[in-house]
Amino acid sequence: MGNSPSTQDPSHSTKKEHGHHFHDAFNKDRQGSITSQLFNNRKSTHKRRASHTSEHNGAIPPRMQLLASHDPSTDCDGRMSSDTTIDKGPSHLFKKDYSLSSAADVNDTTLANLTLSDDHDVGAPEEQVKSPSFLSPGPSMATVKRTKSDLDDLSTLNYTMVDETTENERNDKPHHERHRSSIIALKKNLLESSATASPSPTRSSSVHSASLPALTKTDSIDIPVRQPYSKKPSIHAYQYQYLNNDETFSENSQMDKEGNSDSVDAEAGVLQSEDMVLNQSLLQNALKKDMQRLSRVNSSNSMYTAERISHANNNGNIENNTRNKGNAGGSNDDFTAPISATAKMMMKLYGDKTLMERDLNKHHNKTKKAQNKKIRSVSNSRRSSFASLHSLQSRKSILTNGLNLQPLHPLHPIINDNESQYSAPQHREISHHSNSMSSMSSISSTNSTENTLVVLKWKDDGTVAATTEVFIVSTDIASALKEQRELTLDENASLDSEKQLNPRIRMVYDDVHKEWFVPDLFLPAGIYRLQFSINGILTHSNFLPTATDSEGNFVNWFEVLPGYHTIEPFRNEADIDSQVEPTLDEELPKRPELKRFPSSSRKSSYYSAKGVERPSTPFSDYRGLSRSSSINMRDSFVRLKASSLDLMAEVKPERLVYSNEIPNLFNIGDGSTISVKGDSDDVHPQEPPSFTHRVVDCNQDDLFATLQQGGNIDAETAEAVFLSRYPVPDLPIYLNSSYLNRILNQSNQNSESHERDEGAINHIIPHVNLNHLLTSSIRDEIISVACTTRYEGKFITQVVYAPCYYKTQKSQISN
């Protein structure tokens, strides 16, 4: 078995065709392979096939030459057809007919009905034809060969079917008009299968090619190339305009869109108004689908827009003409294009004013009156923001189709809150427009009609000259007045960031009353803290309720109650004592006459809930955090406020009732009640106290004088006699213990010898015995009660002895 081929084609032995060095390298590489050793016949077949295809394939690599050597003129079984001739043009990679042929021999074909013989075996010796010619899988190592042919750009191919022409005509065509044989074979197979109603599976490709008419460009199959919608970003965040790349559409594509959109409900959006929005990508996809679904509506809307513009030009109305050119679909009241629920939700989320303008134009006159009325009632601080609202209303939206996606404008307060249901996002911004108040302030309204005139004065030092700078420093008051702008804040305070936290309000000097006051101070209901600044020194007033802040500084404070015209916080203890505590001979103070005025809109107030008419001068309770007294009869006012009686009645002070009877708790004796009111005849004579009777009532000097018998007995003997008759009860357990006695004795000895033993003084009483009342048993009608407390590291025990007539009372009861 040699490595040289057994047979060679003499016609190509002396001719060096183009690319011969590639074939020599390929054959040299194949000599050492296992396939060349097993199949000797394969060498001659490969050599003959390579020489045959070299005329047409030129420098095509050997592996492509093996695939291109199959001639499309053969049938499925590999034999030559009688109606066709060998075509010298480039061979196709796919067959013309993919149907199975019944004429194929079972022994000569595989399961896929493909034979192992080719067109080169025709006319060959019989023993060579019978032997199967296996195609080589290629060299064992990957090889890269140079080629001069350019690779086809698949993206530039026009996927249309063209006529079959000769090789010269096909080569003369441009590169992008030539097609791969695989695409042509597949398209041709589709045409053949569609031309016959029931194609026979055994029909050969030659029959199909003969029965089909000549293919023209009009009968070609065009593979439609879908033009995707491009996503153009707009000024909106998470919002895009989905428009087609081509601004003009053909009539066929428009008819197809109209036919497809008939079966789609325009109102059936992907997301309904009550669905939960998960993320922005879901909204974008839903909006894109709605844009495609409403293409028919947009086209009809554009036609209506053109008619509307022409009609406006004929009338000559310049204002309507400008509005219809920019916003013909949105400003019309009669024509309303159907809009899906998803589009409505996107408009509400991103501030589109199209739907709001539709509803507002229907009630334009009513809305305009409501706006003018509410604009006049707002404060000066919000007029600048409302000016931008007018410019926003004058600016009309521009609609290019049925759905308008405008750039996101900054949200402004919408006045007509009850006119449109789409003004919820704007009202959400109003709640955050007001500045944050202090935790001590309970400001619930900014309407000037509900504010109360507060008179604040500085009366502590009447010698303060008019040239002195006096200010009120209060964060709570400045926060309440920030929106109203009724008081002029200090310019220095507005420039200094630290002073903005404690803005200063200038006080005015009254030459008549010689006092400082704040003019025109209107505050809503709430609690306010303040301090006075005199020549830059912070202080507080003693004529106002005082409290302490978190840092321990003294501050003044007052409370504004709702429903009063004018209040003046004031505290004067002398005036309070003279007004609250009148004598019985003086007439009781009467409340001032009540004045009827419109009730307040506050429903949470105690007075408005009860429907009580409020006086012009309040009886408010300015007691402060320290529960200090008030100038306005606080006790009577609190009782009236807490009671359910008539609040119109006069205040009646409580009358004290005196008695001459001594309660039994304070009677000292055998329990008999002594009445002062009783006559002397009713009182029974009793034995005077002595050593043997009622010893507790005896005088100590008289008692011991009797015991000593005029000096016959000394004091110690008399004391021993007394203790023998009336023994003193024992001390408590923790005081009568041997341990404590031993410690006390040691301490006494150390003190006498002037030697302090600190370790010996350790008489610490257990904490469970502290602040507990300890008693002893009743002995000789005497009971002792003791209690130990701790004071600055020392223990103090107090023992109280009290008489107890338990036996005497028991004997009297038994008698």
UniProtKB/Swiss-Prot annotation:
Residues 313-326, 377-389, 599-608 have a biased composition (Low complexity). GO terms for biological process: regulation of cellular response to glucose starvation; regulation of protein-containing complex assembly; signal transduction. The keyword Cytoplasm applies. GO terms for cellular component: cytoplasm; cytosol; fungal-type vacuole; nucleotide-activated protein kinase complex; nucleus; vacuolar membrane. Residues 1-88, 117-146, 311-335, 362-389, 581-616 are annotated as: Disordered. Residues 724-804 are annotated as: Association with SNF1 kinase complex (ASC) domain. Gene3D superfamilies: 6.20.250.60, Immunoglobulins. Pfam families: AMPK1_CBM (PF16561), AMPKBI (PF04739). SMART domains: AMPKBI. Belongs to the 5'-AMP-activated protein kinase beta subunit family. Present with 623 molecules/cell in log phase SD medium. Component of the SNF1 kinase complex, a heterotrimeric complex composed of the catalytic alpha subunit SNF1, one of the three related beta subunits SIP1, SIP2 or GAL83, and the regulatory gamma subunit SNF4. The beta subunit serves as a bridge between the catalytic and the regulatory subunit. Interacts (via KIS domain) with SNF1. Interacts (via ASC domain) with SNF4. This is SNF1 protein kinase subunit beta-1. The lineage of its organism: Eukaryota, Fungi, Dikarya, Ascomycota, Saccharomycotina.
